[in-house]
Structure formats: C-alpha cells, structure tokens
C-alpha cells in the first residue's frame, strides 16, 4: 500500500519527487549501516519494529490526507507531506522535547523564542513551494523548499505539542 502510494501518487508530483530526492539522499547515506547493525542484534530488531509501527500509521494517515485534495495533486502532496511531518513531530519528537523543556527553564525560554521564527520558516517554505510549483522548472529550489517545509512542520508540531503538554502538566 505505502509503496504504491509513494510511486503512484507522491512521485508523480513535482513537490513529492523533489522532496523524495532529498530524503533518499539523506536516508541512504546512513541506512545501510544501521540496517546491518539492526540485523546483527535481535533485541535491536525488535525495538526498531516497535518504533516503526507508529510511522506506518502516520504514513497511512498521510495517504488519506492526499486523497482529501483530489483537485490538484501538487496541493495534495503538500498537504500529505505537512500532515505526515507534523504527526512525526508530535509522535517522535514531542516526548523527548517535553522532557528537555521540563528539565531546563533556560531551554524552555529559548524554545518560546523559537515560536515566531519556526512559524515564519513554515509559512516562508510553504510560499516558496507554491511559487516553485507555479513557476516550474526550479528543481533545486523545489528540493530546498519542500525539505524546509518538512523540517518546519516537524519542528513546529513538536514545539506546540510539547508546550501544550507542559501547560497541562502545570495545571495539576
């Protein structure tokens, strides 16, 4: 299912194929070594399987989000990418970030100061993606813009979730 979604939907768009080119270059720069290490240690293999289950669910949700925007595949790919990135940020990054922010008030203040820059990075990268789709042919800018959008989505969602969790905990 997920491979078909990637190949038949995401890679058929400029935004999706641009992001996947960057993602694959990053991912395959380290994954063979990690895969070998996991293969050699059964405990690590079990732990990685458990850690990947939420990711599979997140990717399925992203596929559903893609199909909510049937009129334009480029917009659908961006929506799917933002949904997936935001959920990855919430599921995988917000827990350790919450622990770090709860431990250090200095880091918490720094995180609060990041809200505006992260929001601007998200909006700027979204505008850049839209502009490169409209102008076409700017593959390097599209690769940069889609990657920046994913990173901004990850960061924003993790920050927001962590700060919400801390607020809820402080009310107790």
Identify what each model region corresponds to.
Residues 1-172:
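Long, compositionally biased charged/polar accessory segments in the mid-to-C-terminal portions
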């Amino acid at each position: 299912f997920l491979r078909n979604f990637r190949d038949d939907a995401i890679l058929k768009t400029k935004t999706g194929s641009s992001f996947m080119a960057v993602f694959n270059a990053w991912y395959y720069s380290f994954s063979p070594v990690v895969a070998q290490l996991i293969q050699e240690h059964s405990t690590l293999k079990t732990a990685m399987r458990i850690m990947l289950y939420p990711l599979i669910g997140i990717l399925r949700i992203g596929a559903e989000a893609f199909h909510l925007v049937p009129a334009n595949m480029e917009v659908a790919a961006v929506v799917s990418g933002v949904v997936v990135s935001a959920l990855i940020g919430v599921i995988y990054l917000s827990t350790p970030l919450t622990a770090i922010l709860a431990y250090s008030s200095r880091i918490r203040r720094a995180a609060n100061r990041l809200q505006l820059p992260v929001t601007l990075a998200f909006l700027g990268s979204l505008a850049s993606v839209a502009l490169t789709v409209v102008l076409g042919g700017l593959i390097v800018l599209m690769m940069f813009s889609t990657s920046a959008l994913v990173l901004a989505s990850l960061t924003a969602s993790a920050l927001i979730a962590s700060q919400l969790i801390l607020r809820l905990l402080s009310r107790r």
